[in-house]
Amino acid sequence: MARSKTYQMLMKISGDSSSLKKACEAASEHLDTLGNAAKAAGKVAATALAGIGTAAAGIAVAATSVYTEHEKAANSLAAATGATGKELENLQSAMETVYQNNFGESIEDAASAVSLVSRNIKGLSNQEIAGATEAAIALRDAFEYDVEESTRAAAAIRKNFGGSAEEAFGLIAAGAQNGLDYSGELIDTINEYSSQFSKLGFSADGMFQLLQSGADGTAWNLDKVGDAVKEFSIRAIDGSNTTVAAFEALGYNAATMMDTFAAGGDGANQAFFDVLNTLMDMEDQVARDALGVSLFGTMWEDLGTEAMEAMANASAGAYDTMDALEQINAIKYNDLDSAMEGVKRQAEAVLVRIGEQLAPYAKEGLEYLVNNVLPVVSSKLEEIVPVVIDAGKALWENRGTILALGSAVVTAVGAFKGLQVASAAV
């Protein structure tokens, strides 16, 4: 701190040896110390405020960026489903839930999966949509099933047998874990043959039990098991001479049997297994195969005796899903990368809320930029560009002179430095 004029005047009056001079010097030193401390404190405060400002700006930029990504995903969801108003809000909520629970490769991926679930599986609540989406993504990650295909399969199960989407996905997951996809046809078999199983009074559990029995009984293709059921469901009620003769040869009243199968339900299911077991109990293998073909078509021959016998002994109990989806989620996503991604997404949730508040101001700023700043800049550019072009042309036209002048300057500078060295040596 510079000493004051008052202090300097006192020095002149008091003289160098006076006590007043000493007192003033002591006071001045204290004032200098206080001033330096104040400056230091000011610098610290300024630095702190600058740091806070930089951090706040960084958070604002990050929040706006993340919010924009989520907004784009929501727009994609709206476009894919045609949802508006409250329905769209519910789908957006499901999308955010799925993403926050660490399912999907990105928020866009979560939006795409939610839209497929919404379109393919009707009548789900917001919570059920989120759960079904997470299940579909888990099946994709574990077994490489497309979300579109697995949701169609789950929808087929619900349509033909009832039950929740969660139960349907649980059956698919358990079936895959139990090897039902050995021929790569589990999803297609469910989609194509669920309605045929339903006609014969099967439940969803019963269908999976029969598929499992056929697969365990050396059926070389899962599709063949489904096709055998389809053929029987058609022939059992077609009233053809072949069907009538087959039922009568097995000891049944053909008309009664056809009425039973036409009615569906538990009676049809019980009759199906009764006919199948009667066939398997026949000692004459040639006659059995002939009647089997009459009722099951060529699928009887394709599947073979061992597979058909296994199907006849299929369990009537519930298909054990073993909490397959929970196991997949517990194992598949239980690693450091998944944990870190989960933390990142939790942080994103906070940034989205901040970005939502900042977005209107950012949009206003962009509108102002477009409407007020850019037109001015554009008009000025029209004035500046010709001048720059003329200057460039002048430089190019006189490039020889400029290069020669530059060379002369370099030579002169070199000579001057040489003279400096020589002078220093002398």
What function would you assign to each model-found segment?
Residues 278:
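Cys/His-dense Zn2+-coordinating finger/ribbon modules
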